Amino acid sequence: MKHWRKIVSLSLALLLFFSSVAMISAEEIKQEQATLLLVPLDDRPANVYFPQKVGASAGIQVISPPKEMIGKFTQPGNGQEISKWLLENGDQADGFVISTSMLAYGGLVASRTGVKSLEEATKDIQVIKELKKLYPEKPVYVFDTIQRLAVTAISDEYLKYYSLISEWAVLYDKVVNLGMPGKERLEVLESTIPATVLEDYKKARARNHTVNNLMVEWVNEGYIDHLILAQDDAAPYGLHRAERELLLQKVNQLDVEDQVAVFPGADEVGVVLVSRFVNQLYKTSPAFFIEYGGVHGKDWIAPFEDTTFDYNVQKHIVSAGGRVVDNEDDADIHLLLNTPSESGTPRLEDIEELVARTNELTTSGKQVAIGDVLIVNKADEAFVTELAETVDLTKILAYSGWNTAGNALGITVGHAAARTAFLEQQSGFGVPLYEQAAENHYEFLLHRFAKDQGYKNVVHPAARAYIGQIGASEWDLGNKYDLVNSFVKERLTAETVNWYQYFDDKEVYIGSRGNKDFYKTISSLENVHVNLPWPRIFEAELEPELDLE
């Protein structure tokens, strides 16, 4: 089995010839592509690499500010510099996707602290209004988060308060807002959690809620074309519940329900809004037919979420530019969701049926996207193992099992809707752009399986054990970072090579021009980039590079 391309000697003349062709093709591709400026939630792969790959798989360029502007881990991004960057590059853009959390506070982690005042935060988001005034015809999509229950686990000390503050926020909502029992435990928590930690938490929540409200008002005033307020990790009860209800009331009062979506999630929203831009660009709206591999979404509230899952599915599809259909004959995309088995149903039976259904659809030429939402933060190992042995993975349109159900859902839906929109558009792009888009598509698909199964189920547990052996903390690697990073690089590269076997030498469809369909063969895995972006092992950069011939 081929894994790595053998490097052979070429004559200088031949090398120069092919280099010239590549340069011409690259320039032609750039001229054909639309450009989207993305201000990400933070610098992690889910918020930068994922949207860029999904955009590239749909034939567009997604460009984010330089790394030094968007911060890293506990170092916040610079909203003022990012605002300048947006204004300096706005002329070249065809649209904007902007994280308010990055502009206002410096990113997701910084948004959970009260360091930035409300005055400072609102000052740094004024660029949103400026962009719409300068470019009224260009779409401005904005997303913000409704703060999660817990603080960020940036150290073992903060990890101690992670669960306590979550419990306090849930109990406060039950006892104070809803008159339910639990007052004694609430008082114990308030005496246990340091006053400074609790006050900072409440200060951040109040400020963020004010900014959430302001964004809804800006939709009504015409500065924002579509707004997503994503509920970060939550539960059915908590301070966020009251905040969400107030926001929904405001949305209804202003009659902007068609432009504002409120749903559980956070890290997937960049992908969702890239997909929305793609579908607007190509004037498409893919039809999704939804099938559940286990319990129906109306009967399940996923962990860390506060609404029924079917509600979340509907909201993600519409925000991504798609639509839901009740008749599978009308579907452009079959969305298969790997949900928990119903009581009394053997798990293996559900797995076999879902894999068989996937195989039935793909072999008959249907587009299938899979949301592996069963287990938080990783693939359902039994399911993806059976899937890989039974189904041609290159025939699957999109897959994700990463993090919360909402995260996995949004990544799957966004990738599927964007890729479908590109394949259905009639813009008459040149073949080089189809080739480039296909490479990006299959690279991201390989990334998803290798990351969600290979990293989360194999490498991550091994890395956790290794960290214990060398006396480090998985939440702050400190001076052990290089050791752990090398450990992860070696093993995740091997896992990616292993998953590449299901892509190697497969002929794949890349697009059509007129009446002619074009195909390429996945010929090699050229490179695998692996790195830990933050000094912890929760997430890893994984960027495989494929060659199609």
PLM features: residue spans?
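Bacterial N-terminal signal peptides that target proteins for export
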Residues: 1-11
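Generic detection of intrinsically disordered/low-complexity segments and helix-coil linkers/edges
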Residues: 11-12, 528
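Hydrophobic core
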Residues: 12, 16-20
